[in-house]
Amino acid sequence: MAKHRYLPMTEQDEKEMLDVIGVKSIDDLFQDIPEKIRFKRDYDLKPAKSEPALLRELSKLASKNANTSEYASFLGAGVYSHYIPTVVDHVISRSEFYTAYTPYQPEISQGELQAIFEFQTMIAELTGMDLANSSMYDGGTALAEAAMLASGHTKRKKILISGAVHPESSNVLKTYATGQHIEVEVIPELDGKTDIEALKKALSDDIAGFVAQYPNFYGQVEPLAELEKLVHENNSLLLVSSNPLSLGLLTPPGEFGADIVVGDSQVFGIPESFGGPHCGFFAVTNKLMRKVPGRLVGETVDENGKRGYVLTLQAREQHIRRDKATSNICSNQALNALASSVAMATLGKTGLVEMAKQNLDKSHYAKQKFREKGFEVLFSDGFFNEFVVKLSKPIKEVNKSLLDEGIIGGYDLGFYEEKYKHHMLVAVTEMRTKEEIDAFVASLEGAK
């Protein structure tokens, strides 16, 4: 008989397995773990509950969370509250799509491969690049992989990154760089954008690439044309991390001459989910095609001349080349990429532009209301859907008060930068109404 209800292994099965590997007991398998830190007690689990009782308890726990369908959220900083068309969940819940993995058998996976191909196509069009891969873990890892590509392509071991790039993405890059013995230098931010003079001084023959964010962490739109000229005159690569929704209005980075464009497609069809899982994208020019990390789906024809889709250029990948691969990324975010594909296809080009325009208009309306009420709003008016407001009280304290009023406040910039203590990064998406924006501004009057 099996010792555990849901584990089919019997005591005899266990004994035979231990005999094969020459071990007397299960405990011997953990002999490398010091005796004093091994867990030997029984788990203090509550008695089993019926399904209705369990659902009640889980619902009670879930109700402690602030749900953005019930609260007016002005929180962004990389993860945003956007409308998700109902059709998205319907499509991704279909059994033939319900996996995070890229299909290796094209004969039985044409639907999923075509959906991934469409994702690549739409991302390439949005970013103005020649091609995009099937997805990455998230925007941060996509940025780090871009830096690794730049270093490998240029044979240089130093990356410059703007201080106006999201701090979490910057930290992911630094983690990657440590293992690859790549030096990362942060170019300071000045008035919410990259300090151009500091960048000029930092550029040298050992610089593989420069990383900018567009729009950046503070919501500002970086001068990509000027950055591109400086970086390419140094024979370095220009890497741009971008919010793909903003590209419904802004000039795509590819048109400025960016070599690699990365970001997160969470803004299309993917819920906030406490910060993940989301879906990174990675787009490049043709000259870097064979150095792209992750999966690439290509269009071809079968022996009957019919259109088909396959994984292509696989010699780059770790399941083929192992330690010589362009990257060791393995499973990707195929299911979330599908969600973004469905959302983008549902919006269409006109709908995407309208969604981006609502973000722009509503955030600028909010900024104007703050100024009318006497708040100090930092930096220029050249932003997409985020801006910085200075308050007189700690942001943590302010946000706690806002939550009691049914409002999720903006991001506390002082968490990363002491000079931005008492500064709130406010995000305004198409989900917010005029009444909610007015109420938000009014609620902050006491913290002006």
Swiss-Prot record:
InterPro entries: GcvPA, GDC-P_N, GDC_P, PyrdxlP-dep_Trfase, PyrdxlP-dep_Trfase_major, PyrdxlP-dep_Trfase_small. The keyword Oxidoreductase applies. GO terms for molecular function: glycine dehydrogenase (decarboxylating) activity. It is an enzyme of class 1 (oxidoreductase). It catalyses: N(6)-[(R)-lipoyl]-L-lysyl-[glycine-cleavage complex H protein] + glycine + H(+) = N(6)-[(R)-S(8)-aminomethyldihydrolipoyl]-L-lysyl-[glycine-cleavage complex H protein] + CO2. The glycine cleavage system catalyzes the degradation of glycine. The P protein binds the alpha-amino group of glycine through its pyridoxal phosphate cofactor; CO(2) is released and the remaining methylamine moiety is then transferred to the lipoamide cofactor of the H protein. HAMAP family: GcvPA. PANTHER family: GLYCINE CLEAVAGE SYSTEM P-PROTEIN, GLYCINE DEHYDROGENASE (DECARBOXYLATING). Belongs to the GcvP family. N-terminal subunit subfamily. This is Probable glycine dehydrogenase (decarboxylating) subunit 1. It comes from Listeria monocytogenes serovar 1/2a (strain ATCC BAA-679 / EGD-e). The gene is gcvPA.
